[in-house]
Each structure stands twice: as structure tokens, then as C-alpha cells.
Amino acid sequence: MKSFAIASAVLALAVSLSGCIGAPVALTPQTEQRLQSQAPIRFLLTFDDGPSASGYNNPSRSVVADLAHNPVLPGIKAVFFLQTEAARSGGSSRGRKTMEREYAGGHILAFHTATAFHTNHRWLNNAELESTLAQGSADIAAITGAPPVLVRPPFWNYDRRTFAAYQRHGLHVLLTDLSANDGKIWGFNGSPRRRANLYRQLSVVRERIALGELPTVDGVIPVVVTFHDINRYTARHMQEYLQILLDSAQVTGMKTAAEPFY
């Protein structure tokens, strides 16, 4: 009886979530024609909030392994936006070793925060903000030999003051085009509508690409995708997510590059 109640609750949650995601934007003949003059897309995978410091089936390390070895495109490279000082993240010895492993695997180490917790940078005073930026840059430089050039602010929230501080530290803000919406780490962190979610989001991005709003870099249009590598559900489904992204491109009428991932 208890298992039935749990299953019913999960089903009810899935049904409620299904109402939050609309159908993909319809591909019109006009959009289809405009896309013919656009470069193919290539997915740029990014990961927030890591590295995990867990000693049990570490999700960040699982993600790195799946990017290296998968049936879609072995050797995918990603950008990891890191919490370099959090005790359950990069501030631990295991977290530091995971960051070193990510860099050794050819991935880009980028800055998320160097606060003890996932603190909104807008809440920090000037001295605290300067301190976390300097500390985070030093943490990453100790691994890579150079300070990071990319930042994704906690909660993706910044203002003129924090943006100016990022610029002083040589950091460029990178947000996202697509999101797995997997930022909930504790409790129910699954994504029963993950396929519909990405179909819908890519169809919206497709409309922008058709209008020439996304830049072309080296013959392809990068489409930034965001996951959370500390989410165990995401880590378990990483290879499936790779296939979903390819399926999303096909369903929405998008051309992908010969190598669809970086």
C-alpha cells in the first residue's frame, strides 16, 4: 500500500509537470527557408555547481566518464562552472582532485563562486565580492596555470556592480540557450519531461537562429546547454541526454555539425 501511494504521488507530480511545458514552436516554411542560409549548430555542454565531493558514486566523475566514453560522440568536451571553496564541492580534497581530473580530460574550468555556500554575488559587499573573485581565480589558476575567463553567477543573477567586478577580473559572463532544469539537487530531482523540455526550448532557439540572432563561430553556431553535474539523476542519465539533444535537433528541423558536440 505504501509503495502504491508513493507511485501515485510521483505520477501526480509528473502529470502536474507536464502542464508546465508547452509543445515545440511549429516550424513554418518561412523559418525553414531562413535556416537554409544559417550554419549548422553544435552543442556546447556546460555544468553548474560542481564538483561533487561525494565519496559514493561521485556524480561529477560519472559525468566526466560519460562525456569521454559514450555511443553518441566519444571525447566530448564541456565547461564546468565551479564552486571552488564550498566544503561539499571544490573546497574538499576530493573536489579538488575532481577539478584536476576535469582539466586533465580537456574540459574548461570556469568560475561559479568561491564563497562557502552558493551565495548570490549581489548580496556580497564590495570587499567580499573582490575576495571571492580573487580566490576563485587563484583556485582555478592553481590547476590550469591561468585564471578563468568565463563566469556564470550563482542563480544566474548579476547587476551592474557585479558585472563590472567580473570585468575587472577578466571574466566574461556566459549564461545559456537550453537548460535541463535540473538545479534541484535534493529530494525529487528527476526530470520526467526532460525530452519535451529540450524539444520545446530548442524550437524557441531555432526561431532566433533563423533570424540570425546567434553568432557563428568557426563555421558553426554554438548552442549552450546547461546541466548540474552534482545532480545524481542527471549523472545517471547523461548518455540519454546526449541522444535527446540530437533528437531535439532532428525534431525541430535544425542542422547539426558533423561533430554535434564540442
Q: Where are these predicted regions, by residue range?
A:
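Active-site beta->alpha N-cap acidic-glycine motif
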Residues: 22-108, 115-117, 137-142, 146-148
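Catalytic domains of cell-wall/extracellular-matrix polysaccharide-remodeling enzymes
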Residues: 90, 94, 116-262
